[in-house]
């Protein structure tokens, strides 16, 4: 893995506008950063990214299978008891999932380490699957990278294939909250993939969902919603006043209820418990448990429910705060994880996001930040394969 500078396309703003990339600049700061690119060899991708992703995902599914049979685990995950049985039912029925993203730290001279699994509402999808590929095609044409360069990116192909597998004559609804540009773009992109698969689709904001007779969900025209993709956290749905309606399983949600076990930072201590010493895992433990690291080693504290680095704190071996990100999750239960520093290139720390669609590893995106904690504003940098 090498990073090098590349020229920015002179008409980048127009290209972004033409392709609906409305958030390539966030708060007057660069989000999509194509002034640099990462180069990987095919062997690095296959052995260090794709293969571990596939193995870790299967391990995660084993955790789900154990968790739905163990009330102690569900308690540690802070999942409300009201939903334990319906989550287990969702798993037994193999309610279909769509996608997820594993976040890795990789320094190049040791196996990748899994930091967390964003299995419910992962973003940076559009830029990983689509806009990054546009960059590759332009970069090859202009000669700034080898003309035979490739990219680890079959994300869009797999998404369309997955929507084909999920095809139904009933419309597929796509939902997110209002006033969230990145979420809206992600949902529109997924909706487009569904349409390419021949699936009728409709968009509705979460705030516009209605309740019909008997507690069915309806759209603004009072049509009953039977299937919906929601870029809205499962734990928020469970905590909502109407959350108990999830128990009736009238709608098919994507992501399904069993994903609440994987979209939880408590997954990390469970993986370490069931697969101790695995080369791609970091020692992790729940608050109140015996630390799984030696005295004097650095560690990270994370809320069980947290997104985009919110309320994550890094401590050194003397319990001094090294870095901290503010957020809205300070009151959530906490887990602890051995600290794995991100590789540093110049003034930036690099995080690899490895994508999974329907249980298959299929691509990646790279984020950079000037701090050790990756956030929603962290820059996205394209990659390519050569050699």
Curated annotation (Swiss-Prot):
InterPro entries assigned: GSPS_pre-ATP-grasp-like_dom, PreATP-grasp_dom_sf
Pfam families given in the database record: GSP_synth
Binding residues annotated for Mg(2+) 1, in chain numbering: 103, 116
Family that this chain belongs to: Belongs to the glutathionylspermidine synthase preATP-grasp family.
Lineage: Bacteria, Pseudomonadati, Pseudomonadota, Gammaproteobacteria, Enterobacterales
Entry keyword set: ATP-binding, Ligase, Magnesium, Metal-binding, Nucleotide-binding
Disulfide links within the chain: none
EC number assigned by the record: 6.3.1.-
Database matches in SUPFAM superfamilies: Glutathione synthetase ATP-binding domain-like, PreATP-grasp domain
Residues holding ATP: 101-103, 265, 302, 309, 337, 372-374
Protein name, per record: Putative acid--amine ligase YjfC
Signal peptide (residue range): none
Described function: May be a ligase forming an amide bond. Shows ATPase activity. Despite its similarity to the C-terminal synthetase domain of Gss, is not a glutathionylspermidine (Gsp) synthetase. Cannot synthesize Gsp, glutathione (GSH), or GSH intermediates, from GSH and spermidine, cysteine and glutamate, gamma-glutamylcysteine and spermidine, and gamma-glutamylcysteine and glycine. Does not bind to Gsp.
Domain of life: Bacteria
